[in-house]
């Protein structure tokens, strides 16, 4: 039996991805503790897992990348936030290690400070990544803008140029992170590209064909999407709803995407669909809701997906992959963060359509959703591939292997 310590960043969409694997580890006889957002602790404890909040000073540093004017500007803003959090994550994880005495540490890939502390601990440790893998590779577009893959020379020059620019742009973040690493006796990073490969193991919550085919880094184990969500009662109105459902989602972390819900409500008002929107960071009372629609802050998506004709997604990895894992096509309207990359993958894998928020209009959104509905076959192919990726059990086995390697006796 081993003790596993899981550490998440404060983003709402990053708290639940490791939960299914934590349950798998527990069911194999291991002790599991999760340090996560204060809002998630109760839901995790109800599962019989040990949980505690991360340092509140970390949660008090919000992502403000939604204010950026470009995708690269948003990435830079996010890195600045990660660096500010790192000052608190390092001692926070060190205290957790002292309290829990783990045999294994599993860290959110967006918690760069916690990862630094995990590496310096000398214990077996791993990353988890709940978004598209950002590392450059041949045939894979430079991460950020959501460009389509292409093997042509112009695209290779474009991608190489942007990758070189990002190395310069993110140099201050790498420099600051290296100061933390030096204080802990760790070697310096050469660039931001070192972060995804520095852990002995990275559990990637995705899989081909949603992900672009590529030569994967040796530390990556792609296990398919993280589908766990808190149990919720099936909405009482769902059983009586006979119309095909269009599910609309907004980001759980504020990014000013309420216009997507407003546009969807207008696009399908009076149409033969039931529109169900989860507003998350937005107040449901702020929307004018037509007779064939409802807006609630949160609803369990799983039972609704079982009845959905399509999902209108903001391009968040969690909602998008839950839809595709259910074989439901997606119309992705990305705003920022990894959403541009997620939305392009929806289009490229044949699981739905992509509509730029700059072109967002009721008639265009309706046309894009109707086109997405015709992509159910592609969504089902992605669903089948996800089911064969191994899921939480594969992730648990990979994590167990780290501890097994550490415990092997040294040959004399």
Regions found by a protein language model. Give the residues of each.
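Nucleotide-activated sugar donor-binding and catalytic core shared by glycosyltransferases
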Residues: 1-10, 16-33, 39-50, 96-99, ...
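Short internal beta-strands
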Residues: 32-37, 275-279
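Conserved nucleotide-sugar phosphate-binding/catalytic loop shared by glycosyltransferases and other
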Residues: 34-78
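Short gly/pro/ser/thr-enriched loop/turn and capping motifs at secondary-structure boundaries
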Residues: 41-42, 58-61, 132-138, 339-340
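Short, charged, surface-exposed secondary-structure boundary motifs
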Residues: 61-67, 135-142, 231-233, 305-307, ...
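A glycine/proline-hinged amphipathic helix-loop "lid/cap" segment
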Residues: 64-65, 75-87, 138-191
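Conserved nucleotide-sugar donor-interacting segment of glycosyltransferase catalytic cores
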Residues: 83-156, 209
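Donor-nucleotide binding loops and adjacent catalytic segments primarily
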Residues: 206-310
